[in-house]
């Protein structure tokens, strides 16, 4: 019945992937979204919420909520940015975040390998590429 339905099939895949990612990042007491935001900040310290929003393709208000959670956990700190806009902040990882950085990256690599093991490297590469192309074009 739903073999042609993009909405149904993309969401079914997202739920299945979310279950795997939720379990994987639970050891850090982070949701996958929080973990990926933190990984971005660890890789590129000093990004603004607007830049993070653009990179993660999430609304700025969502990023603000995620940053509040990470700040309460002691994983990020906000500093006044170099912009003329006093409201714009730069986001930096804390030492606590830096201590788990390698473990977060390792977990990301494990998940990638798990997906390759499930669907194969060519299928994985093709699927991610197609999803990114579709997202740009709709």
Where are these regions (language model features)?
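Short alpha-helical "packing" element that flanks the helix-turn-helix/winged-helix DNA-binding module
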Residues: 37-38
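Charged, amphipathic alpha-helical coiled-coil/dimerization segments
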Residues: 18, 68-129
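N-terminal leader segment of winged-helix/HTH proteins
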Residues: 1-28
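Short capping segments at the starts of secondary-structure elements
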Residues: 44-48
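Residues within helix-turn-helix
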Residues: 49-50, 61, 68, 89
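Alpha-helical DNA-recognition elements
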Residues: 23, 69, 133
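Residues within the alpha-helical elements of helix-turn-helix
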Residues: 55
């Amino acid at each position: 019945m739903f073999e042609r339905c993009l909405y149904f099939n993309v969401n079914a895949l997202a739920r299945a992937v979310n279950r795997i990612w939720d379990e994987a990042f639970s050891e850090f007491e982070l949701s996958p979204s929080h973990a990926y935001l933190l990984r971005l900040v660890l890789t590129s310290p000093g990004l603004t919420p607007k830049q993070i929003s653009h990179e993660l393709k999430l609304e700025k208000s969502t990023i603000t909520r995620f940053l509040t959670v990470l700040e309460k956990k002691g994983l990020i700190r906000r500093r006044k940015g170099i912009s003329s806009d006093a409201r714009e902040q730069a986001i930096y990882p804390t030492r606590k975040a830096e201590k788990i950085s390698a473990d977060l990256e390792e977990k990301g690599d494990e998940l990638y390998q798990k997906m390759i093991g499930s669907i194969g490297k060519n299928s994985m590469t093709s699927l991610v590429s197609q999803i990114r192309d579709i997202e740009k074009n709709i």
